[in-house]
Amino acid sequence: MSQGRRTNELGWHERMSETAEHGTGAANATASPSGAVPPSGATATAGTGDEPGFRYDARLAADIERRWQRRWADEGTFNSPNPVGPLAAGFDEVAGREPFYIMDMFPYPSGTGLHVGHPLGYIGTDVFARYLRMSGRHVLHPFGYDAFGLPAEQYAINTGQHPRTTTDANIANMRRQLSRLGLGHDTRREIATTDVGYYRWTQWIFEQIFDAWYDPQAGRARPIAELIAEFEAGTRSPAAGPAAGTTAVSVDAVRAANPTGLPWAELDRVTRRRVVDAHRLAYISEQLVNWCPGLGTVLANEEVTAEGRSDIGNYPVFRRPLRQWVLRITAYAERLVDDLDLVDWSDSIKQMQRNWIGPSDGAGVEFAVVPPSGSAGAAPGQRIEVYTTRPDTLAGATFLVLAPEHPQVDALVADAWPAGTPGAWRFPAGRGPAVGEAAEVAAEEVAAEEVGAAEVEAAAADPAWTPRAAVEAYRAFAARRSDRQRGEEVDRTGVFTGAYVRNPVGGGLLPVFLADYVLVGYGTGAIMAVPAHDSRDFSFARAFDLPIPAVLAPDEQWYAEHRVTPGAPPSAWPEAFGGEGAYLPGPAGTPVLAGLTKPDAIKTTVRWLEDGGHGRLARSYRLRDWLFSRQRYWGEPFPIVFDDDGLPYAVPDELLPVELPEMTDFRPTAMAEDDESDPVPPLARVADWASVTLDLGDGPKRYRRETNTMPQWAGSCWYHLRYLDPTNTERFVDETVERYWLAKPGAAAGDGGVDLYVGGVEHAVLHLLYARFWQKVLYDLGHVSSKEPFKRLFNQGYIQADAFTDARGMYVPAAEVKQTDDGRFTHHGAPVDRRSGKMGKSLKNSVSPDEMYERFGADTLRVYEMAMGPLDADRPWHTDDIVGSHRFLQRLWRAVVDEGSGTVAVSDEQLDAEATRVLHRTIITLAAEYAGLRFNTAVARLIELTNYVSKRYGQAATPRALAEPLVLMVAPLAPHIAEELWTRLGHSESVSRAAFPVGDPALAAESERTIPVQVNGKVRFTLQVPDGAAEPVIRELLTAHPDYARQTEGRTIKKTIIVPGRIVNIALG
C-alpha cells in the first residue's frame, strides 16, 4: 500500500500545488479491489517532495466536476419526464414513482453576478432533490430567471445598453456560475420572464383576470360573459347597492358608471360597458400612487424609502392620484386568510400574511353631512362612511378626520369659513399664500410651526385664504410625505374643511378635518375621532383645541400610574386611555352600555345603529387592491387596446403575444421634481406601435394600445405552472401535466401545489400573496387543480459577512481590508470599523463563488455552505473555515483511492459487528437528516463516519461494504466526487440513479450501553455495560472501574442500587 494514501491533509493553499501535475482517472474506469492497476487514462506524475500524484485538491476537483457536469448534460441525468407531451420521453421508467415538485424562488439576474450567499437555498434544494431521487421519488427541480422590472432597466440605463442585452448577458453569467455548482436541474424547463414565449402566457392570464368578475354569492370568480347574461336576463341589477350583489365591487365605481341607476335595457352601449368594467377583476381606476417624476414611473410602497424618496436613484416621491390598472385582490381577502390552513408554512409567515391582509370586525357608520349656513359646499344628502372596530365609543367622537385624498373632499369643502373658525384650523395657520401658490408654498413653509395670535388674526382677515385654498395647500403638503412619515408620532397637522357631520349617537355636530395621519388606503379613508381613547386623536385634539369627552372610566391603577387625580376630566390626562374600563352613562336616546362587557357593548351599539339606519355590522381588511401599472419600458406589455370612447378591450388570443417594440431610447420621461404633469410611458413614444388597426368583431377600427407595462411581480405569479410544460404553444400548461405534478392523490378537492418551495423571507408577503391570488383566479375559472400554488414553504437563512466602514461611515471593499498584528482593521492604512451584515454589493462584502471554485472546488463549497448551520438560520461566512470541508472530502477520497497510484483501494473484507453497527446507525440517522432538511447535521454524521473509517482501517483498504454506502450517502451533498468514486468502484450508471442505502434498526442497535453512576445523588462517572447485562455483571464492572475506588475511598458504602440498563446509585456514609 502506498505511503501516499494516508499523508497529511493540508489544503491546496498550504502547499505549492502549482508545481505538480495531477492525474484524474477516466470516468468509466474500473479497478480490482486490490487496486493494483491505475484507472485507464490516469497518469501519475511526479510531485514535489512527498506530495502524492493523486491528491484530491482544487485542480483535481475542477477536472472531476467539469467532466461530470458534461456527462450529466449529455445524458440528461436530471430530466424529469412528463406523463404526456413533448417532455414525456422516458416517463415509462418513472411512472410507478411518486412525483415530487421542488422549486427555488428564482433570482433576478443581477449585473454583478452571484456571491456565495446566493446559492445557499439552491444548494439545499439540490441536496434534497438528489436524496429524494435516490429514495425512489420522481423529482422535478427546474430553474429560471425573474428578469423584467425596474432594477434591470435602471442597470441598462446606467451602463448605456439595451435591457435585453444586459439581461441576456447577466443570465448567461449567472447560469455559468450556477452550473459550476453541479445543480441537478432539468435544464429543458429553464424559463426567463422576459422570453416572448413566456410573457405571451403572462398576458393571457391577465386577460383571464380582465374577463372575470367576483361573484360574492358564489364566493368565486366567474367569466364576465356570465355577468352580462345576468344583466340581460334581469336577474342582476346594474345599479349600485346591496341588492345589486356588488359587495365585492366598488359601489362608487358602479354608481359613477350608472349614476341614475337605470335598468340594463335602458342603458346605452358605452354605459353598459362601463358598468361591466366596474365589476372586472382587472380594472382602471384613479388611484393614489407613489409618483416618482425623477424615474418617470409609479413606485410600489416597498420601493420608497422612509424619507419619501425612491430606493433607486434617491429621487423625491409624491403621493398623487393617477389612472392606473388595478387588480381586485380584495375580493379574495377572506379566502386568502382562510386558505392559509391548507398550506404547510411556518406560523410566522402565515401571521405575516394575515397581518398584511389585516381582517378586522367592526361596524360601518354613516355620518350625515351638515353644511354650514350660507355655504355652497357640502351638498345636502351627503354621508361620510366610517369603519370602526369600536362603535361602542361613538358617544366620545368629537370630530371626523378624512385622508387628504378622500374622494368626497372636493364636494365637502365649504366656500367660506364658518363664523368663529379658529385660525389654527385654517392651515397653514396664518401664513396662507395666494391660491395659485398654495401647493408650492405649503410644502416648504408649513411644518406645523407655532403661530402667534397676530398671525392668526391676519389669517382670519385674508379673504383669499378660503377653506378651498387651505385644503389645496394642505393636500400639497401631505402629498410630499410617505405613508410611513404620515404614520409617525409627531406634531399633528390638519385643516378644517368648513363642513360638519352629525353624530348618530347623541346628535352632536362634529367638524370635519383633513389630516395626513389618516390614509385613504385603510378602512374607508375616514375615521371618527375619539380623542379620550386613541393616542393619535388625543394629540390632534390637543393641537387643535378640540373637546375630549370620556366614554370609558380608567381604573384607579391607571390614574395612579399617570399621576392623575381619580375622576379628573380627560383634558387633564397626560395621554389617552386605551384600556378597557367601565362605560360611563351616555346621552339620552343613545345605547345603554353601562355594566356591559366590551363585546356586548359593541353588539348593542351595532344593533342600535342598524335599527336606526345609521350603520351595520362590517368586516374590513387592511389589504388594498393591487396597483398593476408601471410607466416603464422593461416589462410585459398589456394585451389591451382602447377605442375612441376610452373603453378597454382585450387583444384576441390569436394576436398574442403583444411584443415589446424595439426602442433605442427607452428611458422614461423624467420630470425632476414635477409632481403635476402626467407620466409619459416610453411605449407611448412608439407611434406606429401605440396605434393599431384591429377587427374585434365589428369591422376594422383604429385602437390605441395601453402603453404602461406590468410590474415585475407579474411573471413570478405563475412561473410554477410554466415550468411544468414550458414548450407548450397551445396552453399555458397541459391539464394532465398540471394535475400530475400539483394535485395530491387522495386529498380533498383543491388541495395541492408545489411540494417544496424554498426562498428568502423577504418575499414572505407580497410575492406569495400575489401568486396565491392569481392561482385562486385560475382555480375558480377551471384552469388549475389546486387552490394554493405552494403546498410547503421553507425560508432559508442568509449568509452574513464582515463589512467595514471608514471614518465617513462609507462602506469599503472588504477584500481590501487588512488586519494588523494588534487585531485592528485598516483600509489602505486608514482604520476602519468592522460590523456584520447580509452579504451583498451594498455592504461591499461579497465573496464570489468563482473564487471558491478555483481555490477548493464546487463540492467543497457545497459541503461548507450546508455545514455552516441549519438551512433556515443566518450564518457568518469565514473563508478560512472552508478548508475543513475540503479536508473532509480529501479523507473521503483516500477512503477509496490510493493517492500515490490513483487506484481503487478497497477490499472484500466483511464488516464486523462494530463497523456494521456504525454504518447502519449512520444510514438511519442520515436519512432522517436529509428528509428533515437538516443538512448541517447530515454533514456532521458523514464526517464522523469518514473519521471512523480513517481511524479504524488506517493504511489498510476500506471494506467495499463500507466504502460504497459511504459514497452513496455523500452523493446528495458532494455529487461530483461521489460520481467519480462510484464509477471507480465499478459502477457504470450515475450515482444519482443508485438507491440510497437502507438502514436496519436491528443492526444499528448498540451492543453496549452507557449508564450514569450517581454518588449521593450526583452523577460522578459513567459505566459502559453490555446491552441487556444483568445486575451481577454490572456490579462486577462497577467495582472494577477506577472511578469507583476514587469515589468510595475512606467512605462507608451504605447502599448500592443497580437498575439494569438505566442507572447506578451509591449511598455513602
From Swiss-Prot:
UniProt-listed Gene3D superfamilies: HUPs, Isoleucyl-tRNA Synthetase, Domain 1, Valyl/Leucyl/Isoleucyl-tRNA synthetase, editing domain
Region (Disordered): 19-53, 823-846
SUPFAM superfamilies: Anticodon-binding domain of a subclass of class I aminoacyl-tRNA synthetases (SSF47323), Nucleotidylyl transferase (SSF52374), ValRS/IleRS/LeuRS editing domain (SSF50677)
Domain of life: Bacteria
Gene Ontology cellular component terms for the protein in this record: cytosol
Annotated GO MF terms: aminoacyl-tRNA deacylase activity; ATP binding; leucine-tRNA ligase activity
Key words of the record: Aminoacyl-tRNA synthetase, ATP-binding, Cytoplasm, Ligase, Nucleotide-binding, Protein biosynthesis
Statement: the UniProt record of this protein carries the keyword Nucleotide-binding: yes
Residue spans of biased composition, Basic and acidic residues class: 823-836
Motif ('HIGH' region): 107-118
Annotated family: Belongs to the class-I aminoacyl-tRNA synthetase family.
Name the record gives this protein: Leucine--tRNA ligase
Annotated source species: Frankia alni (strain DSM 45986 / CECT 9034 / ACN14a)
Upper taxonomic lineage: Bacteria, Bacillati, Actinomycetota, Actinomycetes, Frankiales
